[in-house]
Amino acid sequence: MENGRNWRNRELRQHVKVIDGTVSPTLLLKNATYLNVHTKQWLEANIWIYKDRIIYVGEKLPNQSQETEVYDCEGRFVVPGYIEPHAHPFQLANPEITAMHAAKTGTTTLVNDNLTWYLLTNKKKAFSIIDQFNKLPISMFWWSRYDSQTTLQEENHFINTNDVLDWINHPSVVQGGELTDWPSLLAGDDRLLYWIQETKRNGKPIEGHLPGASLRTLTKMKLLGISADHEAMTGKDVMNRLQLGYMVGLRYSPIRPDLPAILEELLESGLTTFDQLTFTMDGPTPYFMKDGVINTCIQIAIDKGIPLEDAYRMGSFHAAKHLRMDEELGSIAPGRIAHINILQEKENPNPIGVLAKGEWIVKETKEIDIPSIIDWSKYEINEMNIDWNLTEDDLQFSVPVGMDVVNDVIIKPYTIDSDVSFEELNEEKGEQFILLIDRKGKWRVNTIIRGFAPKLGALISSYSASGDIIIIGNSKKDIFIAWNRLKEIKGGIILVNNGEILTEIPLTLGGSLPNEPMEQMIKYDKQLKDTLQKYGFAFYDPVYSLLFLSAFHLPFFRITQKGLLDVKNRDILFPATMR
């Protein structure tokens, strides 16, 4: 299979020979009760699979040879592999461990953000990596970003017309977006509009990012080419989008676990047609997805009263159809990739068996060991080597405006009226030093942050929206300890207090991604959250809080490569200092 979705001519001829009886299937699912997503019926059938493709679904049994594995599905229920149409697989994880973890609970297709590739490597190497991902049993597709969702000093170096068009044309890229910089589109950015139109000409949909958008804005964005949006926070938000013709992703994420309430509101509103709805976890951190991905969303939908057949379609077929991939994914029918989940009960979407491209991932609840295939060093994504030093001069804080953390996503500016010239800040005011510093040591941006984790001596993270280094703390002494440790472990997240290292998470792939199993990352993630909460962190997810410190698609004030940013007006109020 080429590009994760197309078979060669000789393979197609071989598939037909299975029907003719001259070639035996590699796997037979016998006596299956399966969900036909096209008719919304549970039907009895034998399912023939040849390698990675479903060949036949019906009453007949094939000619069998010793090479045919027979699995009896009597008393079990079979549904299509689940699809996550909006994945951010880089949140304290890497795409391979995210995919393999998701597959264990039935999510066998991920459509992924490509933004981190822009920051980690060049286009040629990125394309080589995603071609390698096609060799996984999980189907891995990508979307093409139009903006960096932060303010970069060399934005055009990372995201430009040549690169965007090359991404759009790549066969593993199945949609454009997500469009976080939609205000620029409305303000007349014709380059952005050109990219969107080229994506549409390629037959690929566009994912928006439209939290809180009015009907007027939603209408304008539809006219400019946006196909779908996943930022609805209420049932009314969903209905507004549905009525305008949007595909709507219902979100259950660490900072927006809205799905249960949204489903209740939709059912109360009388909605009975769910064809334009999908599910997404929108980039869960490891601990949040410890029990799975789309299986969790389907379970919530079933528990809230969504009809079974619709709940499973929302977790599979709807996404495939929206992405123009329903000939390959999202159903149990001839010609589809053999992504199949075997359930003990219809009402329980947590599978006891998972097939991905016809390969067992889970069999009779036992996880099958699938070896890693991504050699990160081959693409020069290695440890983060820092060959420069943080100095006392870097820890000078004289800007009069600080960052007031209101919740997981909102940061407001405030006037600093404290004396912040000391080696330590008093935790009573909730203030800490904050520094965003270039990973190569060329520039820095300094101010004060209030309401993050005011009791903590130091946090340092090479994980950030721009790939630079974030430092937060109330003790300069602890900051230097954290800095030295970051250099020693060559990238990661480190917490220090009173000279003691409390927690550290190694991120050995470019300082941004881990190269450890998901089980370990789940432990790290929980440890990070628990430790920060002890030191005053009052919000849900610290990983997202770190990521969003620089994100210009959220209100109202951000720390970016260019300086402190007024998000609404896109003005740099205090520019970065060159070192």
From Swiss-Prot:
Pfam families: Adenine_deam_C, Amidohydro_1. It catalyses: adenine + H2O + H(+) = hypoxanthine + NH4(+). Its EC number is 3.5.4.2. InterPro entries: Adenine_deam, Adenine_deam_C, Amidohydro-rel, Metal-dep_hydrolase_composite, Metal_Hydrolase. GO terms for molecular function: adenine deaminase activity. One of its GO terms (biological process) is adenine catabolic process. Keywords: Hydrolase. The keyword Hydrolase applies. This is Putative adenine deaminase OB0751. The lineage of its organism: Bacteria, Bacillati, Bacillota, Bacilli, Bacillales.
